[in-house]
Amino acid sequence: MNTLLLLHPTIVTEPQAVEAAKDSLAQKLGTDKSNISQHIIDRVATGQVSLRPSYYNHIQYLAPPEANVKKLPVKCYEIIFEALQSNGVFEGTIPPESATDGILQGFLVESDTKWVKPSTLGSVVSLKRPAGQNKTKSSAFKKEMPFFKKLSSPPTLTDSSEADEDEESQLNEKLKGSKLIYFDESSDDEIIDEDELLRDDDGALKGPVVVPVKCALPNGKRRKKACKDCTCGLKELEENEQNERLDAQASILSKLATSANAEAEKIEERLRRKQASKEGEEVKFTEQEVTEIDFTIQGKTGGCGSCALGDAFRCDGCPYLGLPPFKPGQAISIEGLGADI
């Protein structure tokens, strides 16, 4: 008996377990231990070791219990099936989930740990009848058969193939004509206006217009949220309201940012002036600016000509507001105005 022992890669590290399995298998099959060959299943699956086809009577798969969870590749079952003889047995630690793969390869699954390769050849059984029955049947059959008289000359046959071809051609022409009529675009075809299907001859609607039911609650209140398959337009209204709300928020935020920037610039300018006044920095004007401001310069007069008379006669924007009256041509110092400018 040709026997093969397939080993899991982790079981190879335990030589004692392998030898014990070989002894048990030899005792079970009643064969010599030397008749049992062994290979690692990974090498068989990758093709490094080739098995002889239809050679083994028994193939045993030895693996640790935890290997029962992981399925073997389908290629392994195909190789094992080809290596077994008819009625050969494959058993061992076979994953239960691999039963379908085994059936697809041709195995008969007898149990979770035993598969059998069925025999593809069946015995031929010849069916014979008794000799006496055959004779009686044949004689009776001969008596029942009628006899016909042979005619002296065979009847003449006429060739009707040409008529059949003519009929077939006429039938084909009729079929082609009927098909072409269906696809023919004739100007006589009447085109129906879709509006006429909705209105009568008087122009009135044939039936009431079906308005989609609004997404309203029984008590008359509006729903907080439109239905998933809303058809009354509530979903579009909600989207428009949301877009308007987002636009308003964006506008407010932009205005706030603009005002904040302007306010920050004013604060920075105010702080700069305050710091300059603390450090005693004097505001200096160019000659043209002094000429425009100081109306006491000879040959220059104010717009109203009353700057030297006092605040009662000075304009609202006069730079001499708050100063006492002075004589025309008198030198006026405006250094005190540095903090206000």
From Swiss-Prot:
InterPro entries tied to this protein: Anamorsin (IPR007785), CIAPIN1 (IPR046408), Dre2_N (IPR031838)
Domain of life from the UniProt record: Eukaryota
Residues that bind [2Fe-2S] cluster: C215, C227, C230, C232
First-listed, main subcellular location of the protein, grouped into a coarse class: cytoplasm
Keywords from the named record: 2Fe-2S, 4Fe-4S, Cytoplasm, Iron, Iron-sulfur, Metal-binding, Mitochondrion
Alphabetized Pfam families for the sequence: CIAPIN1, DRE2_N
Localization per Swiss-Prot or TrEMBL: Cytoplasm; Mitochondrion intermembrane space
Residues that, per the record, bind [4Fe-4S] cluster: C304, C307, C315, C318
Requisite cofactors: [2Fe-2S] cluster; [4Fe-4S] cluster
Region (N-terminal SAM-like domain): 1-157
Function of the molecule: Component of the cytosolic iron-sulfur (Fe-S) protein assembly (CIA) machinery required for the maturation of extramitochondrial Fe-S proteins. Part of an electron transfer chain functioning in an early step of cytosolic Fe-S biogenesis, facilitating the de novo assembly of a [4Fe-4S] cluster on the scaffold complex CFD1-NBP35. Electrons are transferred to DRE2 from NADPH via the FAD- and FMN-containing protein TAH18.
Subunit (UniProt): Monomer. Interacts with TAH18. Interacts with MIA40.
Notes concerning its domains: The C-terminal domain binds 2 Fe-S clusters but is otherwise mostly in an intrinsically disordered conformation.
Full protein name: Fe-S cluster assembly protein DRE2
Source species of the chain: Komagataella phaffii (strain GS115 / ATCC 20864)
Gene responsible for this protein: DRE2
